[in-house]
Design a protein with these regions (language model features):
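Short connector loops/turns at beta-strand edges and beta->alpha or beta->beta junctions
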Residues: 18-23, 28
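A short alpha/beta connector and helix-capping loop motif
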Residues: 9-11, 26-53, 57-62
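Catalytic-core segment of enzymes that process non-peptidic bonds
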Residues: 62-71, 77
Length: 210
């Protein structure tokens, strides 16, 4: 696990929940994260990550939340605020525009070796999905993570990945929170304690040029 983070054959991007419903101005959840998205210029930075990954031939693994469809949460006994909000808003509705990946961030499976993993139900893109299996099949050891939301799905996935033995880098301006304060608390206070590296997108892309 000592190879540099930018070692392309052993490194992958994990991009979490880049759905229209989250990061497009017309998305169902956009209003909840718009302040933080604007403050961090998140969408531009996510596109910068994808562009840099393509140029460096680093595969992107897409960790996506389960799409909503009628009956998804029927008889669930352990709903939390997140699942309740998704149920009531019908965010990421199956087959809808909102459940599509934002234009410019779409996977390139054949050209870049990107992988769309099975969808997560709660916060971690590892729990109840095939992400770990897919990474092991390709002998990936280093993960660079970005996406939504800073202190929920992104952070939870990073924590889980670290527990599984991956070298994890988090990109501070490739994400957003339900408020700028919540996002900043995650990136400034929590992340440095739980992962291997915390960087801006610009700092990370600079390492690819060295």
């Amino acid at each position: 696990m000592s190879a540099p983070t930018t070692s392309a054959p052993k490194t992958a991007i994990v991009l979490i929940d880049p759905y229209n419903d989250f990061i497009h101005p017309e998305g169902k959840l956009y209003g909840r994260v718009s302040e933080s998205l604007t403050a961090s210029d998140t969408v531009s930075h996510l596109k910068e990550i994808v562009k840099a990954a393509r140029e460096a031939h680093i595969p992107i693994y897409y960790g996506l939340h389960q799409t909503w469809r009628e009956g998804n949460y029927k008889e669930w006994q352990h709903m939390n605020s997140s699942t309740t909000a998704l149920k009531s808003s019908k965010a990421f509705e199956e087959g809808s525009w909102g459940a599509e990946i934002l234009e410019g961030l779409e996977p390139d499976v054949l050209g870049n070796g990107d992988v769309v993993v099975s969808k997560h139900w709660n916060s971690s893109s590892f729990a109840n999905t095939d992400l770990d299996y897919q990474l092991h099949q390709r002998e990936i050891t280093h993960l660079v993570m970005a996406g939504m939301v800073a202190n929920t799905c992104l952070e939870t996935t990073a924590r889980y990945g670290r527990e599984l033995g991956y070298h994890v880098t988090l990109l501070t301006d490739g994400t957003a929170g339900f408020s700028t304060a919540a996002k900043d608390a995650a990136t400034n206070l929590i992340w440095p304690m739980i992962v291997d590296r915390v960087m801006t997108v610009g700092e990370w892309t600079s390492t690819l040029k060295n």
